[in-house]
Amino acid sequence: MKVKLEGREYELKANGRFLLKYQEIFKANAVVDLYKSISEKDLLLTEKLTYCAINEELSFEEWLDSFETPLFLMPYMDSILEYLIVGVDPSVKAEKKSDEKKTTSN
């Protein structure tokens, strides 16, 4: 998944490297924190998860400091979390967006 944050494009990957990087940097379980971030809409956890899903040379703190606003991730939070959860938990299916309303017949 590609995401553009304040004019910079990043490629996100939800793979084994993502899980390992998260564990090494934040000493926490990425899958547990991913579910927590989704349920609590936790911006800091989402930033940590996003940072580990991209290939960034800067430290986490330097990466955060490179953005103009602390809310740079807010517009993309839901789509990033959905991408990451589908990548790490195969039992989760991405939501299909549809303009059609479902109807049932009796």
What does each model-found stretch correspond to?
Residues 45-55, 79-82:
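Short, hydrophobic/amphipathic alpha-helical patches that form generic packing surfaces
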Residues 12:
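Active-site-adjacent beta-strand anchor residues
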